[in-house]
């Protein structure tokens, strides 16, 4: 079986400089969903038909082992298939649309099985719409045999005769596909409609059937920003439902966004307004609170992420507590049982087990050991105006509040840093470092000031 994905439309209704099929749904381009679904069927060949002006699409498709066919002129879906026909080598052809990203492999498996089982020459995937749409309708005769497909723009009166809509997804034999050469130009739009192949094939005695195997939401085609938003919500609902069936609790399923590549462990609880993106992996029995965004990160078991925390390309080990209002920037590793508290920013740093930075700190380009206490207001001064430098803090160090550690610098294990210090040199093991100006009390000064 060959698969042909029709993606030559210019997508003018999207009002965008970006090609329609490259717009993203939960971080993934629309056409990637279709290609991945097609590839899961293990076809003999896969083709994508695009307009030559869509150079961005052609460049995007280079990462796939897929053949590109150019439709030199935008003359409609029939002309798009005609452009691909010389390159097809299989007796069966599955036709998909590049703007229908929610189609599932299970649906196509059933569709292909029915086509083969019933010895058909062509099959259509149909559905019964519940909302207003622009899909053509499938007309049947008194014996419920298919007669033709009528487009909503051309035959509005006839549409009252049928509520069965055409999804634009077909499987057909090569000899039926050849009939695309007989399709006439539509007088209203000047295009060649692939839907007209049905009436031609019926009149020639080919065996054709339509199967309503999918819900309307699965077959949504994206032509506008409103439909893009709708598809995002449908996919979100599908993903969240799947995770609930696997033992995840969502306080409000309609207010979370989870990318398809994310994984979540059992008994994790997720609050509203949470975004889990990229290749994020959440362990078991975690708590993800309101307003959290996690991207391309590993969160191990029993971790608590408190409100309004952002985590990017980082690794948090088990039983740690992060936030609220914390920011873990890329390449940060947080050890087991750590506490990274409110308004703490960590960047490109490794923090050992049991270490606490509870308030108002910046930790950048640092290597921090186990059981370290980092006082409120501590800053690793890692940038000298030209390049970044490393701070090393060994095990069991106590850093007092409002400390500046001017990198490169090392604090050896067991050392104490007095509050308000600026540390520029190595601090030896088990010693106290303090660099603040000695306190001076001027007796009676305030009383004199008030009398002035």
Swiss-Prot record:
As its record notes, the protein acts as a catalyst of: alpha-D-glucosamine 1-phosphate + acetyl-CoA = N-acetyl-alpha-D-glucosamine 1-phosphate + CoA + H(+); N-acetyl-alpha-D-glucosamine 1-phosphate + UTP + H(+) = UDP-N-acetyl-alpha-D-glucosamine + diphosphate
Provide the protein name: Bifunctional protein GlmU
Which coenzymes or cofactors are required? Answer: Mg(2+)
Give me the ranges of the annotated region Linker.
226-246
Question: Corresponding gene?
Answer: glmU
* Residue numbers binding Mg(2+): 99, 223
Where can this protein be found? Cytoplasm
EC class, as a word, reads transferase
Q: What does this protein do?
A: Catalyzes the last two sequential reactions in the de novo biosynthetic pathway for UDP-N-acetylglucosamine (UDP-GlcNAc). The C-terminal domain catalyzes the transfer of acetyl group from acetyl coenzyme A to glucosamine-1-phosphate (GlcN-1-P) to produce N-acetylglucosamine-1-phosphate (GlcNAc-1-P), which is converted into UDP-GlcNAc by the transfer of uridine 5-monophosphate (from uridine 5-triphosphate), a reaction catalyzed by the N-terminal domain.
- State the coiled-coil residue ranges: none
Instruction: Please give the organism.
Output: Thermodesulfovibrio yellowstonii (strain ATCC 51303 / DSM 11347 / YP87)
Question: What protein family does this chain belong to?
Answer: In the N-terminal section; belongs to the N-acetylglucosamine-1-phosphate uridyltransferase family. In the C-terminal section; belongs to the transferase hexapeptide repeat family.
Which key words tag this protein in UniProt?
A: Acyltransferase, Cell shape, Cell wall biogenesis/degradation, Cytoplasm, Magnesium, Metal-binding, Multifunctional enzyme, Nucleotidyltransferase, Peptidoglycan synthesis, Repeat, Transferase
Gene Ontology molecular function, alphabetical: glucosamine-1-phosphate N-acetyltransferase activity; magnesium ion binding; UDP-N-acetylglucosamine diphosphorylase activity
Pathways per UniProt: Nucleotide-sugar biosynthesis; UDP-N-acetyl-alpha-D-glucosamine biosynthesis; N-acetyl-alpha-D-glucosamine 1-phosphate from alpha-D-glucosamine 6-phosphate (route II): step 2/2; Nucleotide-sugar biosynthesis; UDP-N-acetyl-alpha-D-glucosamine biosynthesis; UDP-N-acetyl-alpha-D-glucosamine from N-acetyl-alpha-D-glucosamine 1-phosphate: step 1/1; Bacterial outer membrane biogenesis; LPS lipid A biosynthesis
GO BP of this protein: cell morphogenesis; cell wall organization; lipid A biosynthetic process; peptidoglycan biosynthetic process; regulation of cell shape; UDP-N-acetylglucosamine biosynthetic process
């Amino acid at each position: 079986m060959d698969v042909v994905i029709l993606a030559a439309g210019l997508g003018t209704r999207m009002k965008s400089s970006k090609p329609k099929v490259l717009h993203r749904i939960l971080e993934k381009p629309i056409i990637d969903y279709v290609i991945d679904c097609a590839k899961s069927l293990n076809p003999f060949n896969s083709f994508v038909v695009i307009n030559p002006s869509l150079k961005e699409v052609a460049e995007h498709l280079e990462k796939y082992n897929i053949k590109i066919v150019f439709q030199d002129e935008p003359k409609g879906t029939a002309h798009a298939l005609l452009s691909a026909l010389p390159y097809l080598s299989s007796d069966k052809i599955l036709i998909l649309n590049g703007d229908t990203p929610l189609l599932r492999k299970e649906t196509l498996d059933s569709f292909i099985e029915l086509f083969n089982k019933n010895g058909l020459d062509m099959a259509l995937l149909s559905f019964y719409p519940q909302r207003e749409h622009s899909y053509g309708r499938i007309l049947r005769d008194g014996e419920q045999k298919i007669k033709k497909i009528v487009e909503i723009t051309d035959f509005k009166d006839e549409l009252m005769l049928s509520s069965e809509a055409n999804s634009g997804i077909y499987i057909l034999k090569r000899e039926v596909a050849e009939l695309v050469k007989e399709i006439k130009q539509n007088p209203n739009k000047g295009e060649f409609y692939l839907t007209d192949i049905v009436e031609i094939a019926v009149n020639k005695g080919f065996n054709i059937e339509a199967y309503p195997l999918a819900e309307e939401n699965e077959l949504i085609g994206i032509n506008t920003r409103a439909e893009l938003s709708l598809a995002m919500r449908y996919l979100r609902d599908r993903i969240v439902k799947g995770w609930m069936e696997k033992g995840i609790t969502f306080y409000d399923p309609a207010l979370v966004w989870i990318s398809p590549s994310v994984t979540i462990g059992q008994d994790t609880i997720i609050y509203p307004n949470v975004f889990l993106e990229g290749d994020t992996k959440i362990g078991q029995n975690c708590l993800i609170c309101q307003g959290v965004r996690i991207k391309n990160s590993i969160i191990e078991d029993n971790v608590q992420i408190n409100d309004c925390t952002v985590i990017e390309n980082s690794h948090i080990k088990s039983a740690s507590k992060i936030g609220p209002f914390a920011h873990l920037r890329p390449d940060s590793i947080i050890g087991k049982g750590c506490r990274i508290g409110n308004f703490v920013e960590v960047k490109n740093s490794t923090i050992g087990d049991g270490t606490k930075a509870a308030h108002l700190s910046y930790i950048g380009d640092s290597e921090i050991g186990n059981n370290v206490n980092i006082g409120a207001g501590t800053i690793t001064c890692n940038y000298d105006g030209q390049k970044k430098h490393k701070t090393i803090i060994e095990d069991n160090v106590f850093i007092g509040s409002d400390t500046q550690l001017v990198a490169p610098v090392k604090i050896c294990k067991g050392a104490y840093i007095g509050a308000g210090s600026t540390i520029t040199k190595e601090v030896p093991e088990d010693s106290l470092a303090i660099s603040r100006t000695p306190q001076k009390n001027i007796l009676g000064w305030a009383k004199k000031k008030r009398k002035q």
